[in-house]
From Swiss-Prot:
Belongs to the UPF0162 family. This is UPF0162 protein VC_2176. Pfam families: TPR_9, Transglut_core2. Signal peptide: none annotated. Gene3D superfamilies: Tetratricopeptide repeat domain. It comes from the Bacteria.
């Protein structure tokens, strides 16, 4: 189990928190190898950039190293593959999604002295590059490209509708616990999609250590238990959701599901 609180996550680099999360979900996560690989990449970056004195040129060289020489890229073919959210597998495959690639860039960038911050934009994870005395530059970790205000506005409209307006709060830096919470939700969704229910159950159990009475997490846990043929526990979780969210559209559907599962249990017992 993940014995870390919000303060622990804030005290470490995002990629370190993600690795701890990955290990708690899947014990086969190659934690030690990942730390060794991160140290190797950092050493290689330090050597590659040692003669570059101009900070902006140094950062551009860092991006070229990351995306071109090391070959990291966004996984366009299987974006929702759970491997894109396990850091050890991102390091092995050189493929990921914005939050996993962004966490690597943040880790290496901070060690190299670059002023980078993570931003949980409504559509995806972004990085802001904050040179002293200048307006922030926003980077898409999926491909390393600069994102204009116009593009950010277009993304927001596509996500929230034609009346959406880009506001300063959309581009504020976010703390590690918030990102880790969203990372956990992303992993759970990917594992459910892949029907890897035992690992998905670990995600839900972890989420419930942070929000113990969240009816939506308990509903999701019920669904997972149902897939694992643990019908009595599934019924209990569904009933909890129905009692606490009676006006949710899912409540009526779950009542039908509870009746069906109860009937199946009675038939099995007889």
């Amino acid at each position: 189990m993940l014995n870390l609180c919000d303060e622990d996550f804030d005290a470490m680099e995002l990629v370190e928190g993600a690795l701890a999360l990955n290990k708690a979900i899947n014990p086969e996560t190659q934690l030690e190898w990942a730390h060794i690989e991160l140290a190797r990449l950092l050493k290689e970056a330090e050597l590659a950039l040692v003669h570059e004195r101009d900070e902006k040129a140094r950062f551009e060289a860092f991006l070229r190293l990351f995306y071109q020489e090391w070959g990291f890229s966004g996984d366009r073919e299987a974006y929702f593959d759970s491997r894109n959210a396990f850091i050890d597998q991102v390091l092995q495959r050189r493929k990921g999604i914005p939050v996993s690639l962004g966490s690597l860039l943040l880790y290496l960038g901070h060690k190299l002295g670059f002023p980078l911050n993570g931003i949980s934009f409504p559509t995806q994870f972004l990085l802001s590059l904050n040179w002293s005395g200048e307006r922030p530059i926003y980077l898409n970790p999926f491909n390393g490209e600069i994102v204009s205000q116009h593009t950010l506005q277009a993304w927001l409209v596509g996500h929230k509708g034609p009346l959406a307006k880009l506001k300063p709060q959309h581009l504020q830096s976010v703390d590690n616990p918030t990102i880790i919470g969203r990372w956990l939700a992303l992993l759970k969704s990917a594992l459910l999609r892949e029907e890897r229910y035992t690992l998905a159950l670990r995600c839900t159990d972890l989420a419930l250590t942070f929000v113990p009475d969240d009816p939506y997490e308990i509903r999701d846990r019920g669904f997972i238990y149902q897939q694992l043929q643990c019908h009595q526990i599934a019924i209990s979780d569904y009933q909890y959701f129905i009692e606490h969210c009676p006006n949710d559209p899912a409540a009526e559907l779950l009542k039908t599901q509870v009746n069906a599962l109860s009937h199946d249990s009675q038939v099995t017992l007889h």
